[in-house]
Regions:
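NAD(P)+-binding Rossmann beta1-loop-alpha1 motif at the extreme N-terminus of oxidoreductases
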Residues: 1-53, 119, 178-181
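Non-catalytic terminal and connector segments of soluble metabolic enzymes
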Residues: 9, 17, 47, 54-55, ...
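Residues forming the Rossmann-fold NAD(P)(H) cofactor-binding site
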Residues: 16, 69, 93
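Rossmann-like NAD(P)-binding element
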Residues: 50-79
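Short, conserved loop/helix-junction motifs that constitute active-site signature segments
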Residues: 75-81, 99-102
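ADP-ribose/adenylate-binding Rossmann-like module
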Residues: 79-92
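Internal alpha-helical scaffold of NAD(P)-dependent oxidoreductase catalytic cores
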Residues: 95-105, 121-157, 167-194
Length: 194
């Protein structure tokens, strides 16, 4: 059986974790947009964004919201039957479709930082095309636990599962710094970060 070609446009931390996990099951490609230098050492091939859109069966959009319009408009002419999976926070599916020139095979998802451990929750926005949602779920279930939610609930999911871990990491980091600044020994400082 031939492996599907999966491409990532943008390669920040979430994309990097997804690439690491999915590279055993799929042929992975990534564009040179927002490349995390660690991606250079992965089992993935670097392509120009337009070439990635032509070659891949599934395209992950993993860029910051402020460049999403530019990315989708740049690949819109290449989209035919590909599944486009968005990891972009705060942009609705209808807006993504508009930015892609009306292309409808787009599924909005929101992963959490736990995808690096294959156990984080991942939200998938419910939509009219169950087959696209099912196809998305098959792929991203390798990254964590999937939950199909009404799209109106995706932003709340993002706030809780996206910002929540970052908040607690900041608290732990602050506690560690306070411990070190107070002259606690390394083991005591480590206890403060637990």
């Amino acid at each position: 059986m031939n492996k599907q070609n999966i491409g990532f446009i943008g390669c920040g931390n979430l994309a990097l974790q997804a690439i690491k996990t999915l590279s055993g099951s799929y042929n992975i490609f990534y564009s040179n947009l927002s490349i995390n230098q660690a991606a250079e050492n992965l089992a993935a091939e670097k392509l120009e964004t337009i070439d990635l859109a032509k070659k891949c069966d599934v395209i992950f959009i993993t860029v910051k919201p402020n460049v999403t319009a530019e990315v989708l408009s740049s690949i819109a002419s290449q989209l035919q039957n590909q599944l486009v999976i968005s990891f972009v926070a705060g942009i609705s599916r209808s807006k993504l479709v508009d930015l892609a020139g009306g292309y409808k095979n787009i599924v909005r998802t929101m992963p959490s930082l736990g995808i690096g451990f294959k156990n984080g929750p991942i939200a998938i926005a419910e939509m009219g095309d169950k087959a696209l949602v099912d196809q998305t779920e098959v792929i991203i279930s390798e990254l964590g636990s999937t939950y199909v939610l009404e799209e109106k609930d995706i932003d709340a999911f993002t706030a809780i599962y996206g910002a929540g871990p970052a908040y607690f990491a900041l608290v732990a980091e602050t506690m560690s710094k306070l411990a070190a600044d107070s002259g606690l020994s390394l083991p005591d400082k480590d206890l403060a970060s637990v």
